[in-house]
């Protein structure tokens, strides 16, 4: 059986990247929550 996680940098950036997070209100909320928490990395 094939493993479920098949890494791809392109797909990773397109689905979880900073610019994608900035596009929607919910994504911006995620970034603000991570800023408030003091995360070192906001997005991948």
Curated annotation (Swiss-Prot):
One of its GO terms (biological process) is translation. The keyword Ribonucleoprotein applies. GO terms for cellular component: ribonucleoprotein complex; ribosome. One of its GO terms (molecular function) is structural constituent of ribosome. InterPro entries: Ribosomal_bL34, Ribosomal_bL34_CS. The keyword ATP-binding does not apply. Belongs to the bacterial ribosomal protein bL34 family. This is Large ribosomal subunit protein bL34. The gene is rpmH.
């Amino acid at each position: 059986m094939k493993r479920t996680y098949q890494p791809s940098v392109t797909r990773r950036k397109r689905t979880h990247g900073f610019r994608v997070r900035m596009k929607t209100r919910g994504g911006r909320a995620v970034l603000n929550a991570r800023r408030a928490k003091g995360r070192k990395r906001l997005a991948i």
